[in-house]
Amino acid sequence: MPNLKAIRDRIKSIKNTKKITEAMRLVAAAKVRRAQEQVIGTRPFADRLAQVLYGLAERLQFESLDLPLLQKREAKTVGLLVISGNRGLCGSYNTNVIKRAEMRARELTQQGINCQYVLIGRKAIQYFQRREVPILNTYDNPEKIPTADNASVVADEILAGFMAGSIDRVELIFTRFISLISSKPVIQTLLPLDPQGLEVKDDEIFRLTSKGGEFEVSRETVSAAVKSFPRDMIFEQDPIQILDALLPLFLTNQLLRAWQESSASELASRMTAMSNASDNASELAGTLTLAYNKARQAAITQEILEVVGGANAL
């Protein structure tokens, strides 16, 4: 016969665990909302910067631009900037981005290209340090949503390596946010930049809302079309000098948006994982409660039979 006390203790433990996972789910949901607000707050600057760069690129499209950040050279060494999380309990978020980085490194190695890593997030740092790969620098994720200051520190580091010639190309590997239950590791070339190839497309803002007591994501399409500078606009400085000054800002902005999107993906993955854990805990607690009731009923029935048997013996 099952041990009633053991079943009761296990049910209590599972219910306590469910309280923890539910609290973690709500915390992750609140942080996703803050991440959303942060992205929306930085959008005006990003849109204006894209407009200025787009206008300058259009103005200078027939000129030869001899700017360091635009110079493409033979790739002998590629820097892989990998963004992961600091903690676990977020499903396959960290595993997927690390696997994508390893896959890309193998592809480059097969082409005879050396790889050096710049790592963001403790999970990627711990993983690649154990494998003793060449690491240029490591950064912890901030406790809150990444800011422009955080992105600027990393951007300055990779920019210095690119300008010094120790890195010929920088590729960013991060997780693109698709929905609360879906994200995808992607690769984006950060350096060298190409203003002639600046694409300005419609963007989407992901808003975390609630409906029927459940969290869901609504999508809002934002027009990102830009207007060209007037043809008669006069620059006090040489447009090439202006472009040279704005390109580092554009690099930092690109990194910031990817970092914020990775952070939102991690939080959404954690929220989903904790939601699934809470559901599983409820289901397991229900199954154990049923088993407990059956065992208790069997024990009572056995006691009644023993009493009746004893009475008949008298």
Swiss-Prot record:
It is a peripheral membrane protein. It comes from the Bacteria. Produces ATP from ADP in the presence of a proton gradient across the membrane. The gamma chain is believed to be important in regulating ATPase activity and the flow of protons through the CF(0) complex. The gene is atpG. PROSITE patterns: ATPASE_GAMMA. GO terms for cellular component: plasma membrane-derived thylakoid membrane; proton-transporting ATP synthase complex. It comes from Trichodesmium erythraeum (strain IMS101). It is found in: Cellular thylakoid membrane. This is ATP synthase gamma chain. F-type ATPases have 2 components, CF(1) - the catalytic core - and CF(0) - the membrane proton channel. CF(1) has five subunits: alpha(3), beta(3), gamma(1), delta(1), epsilon(1). CF(0) has three main subunits: a, b and c. Belongs to the ATPase gamma chain family. The keyword Lyase does not apply. The keyword Transport applies. It holds the Pfam family ATP-synt.
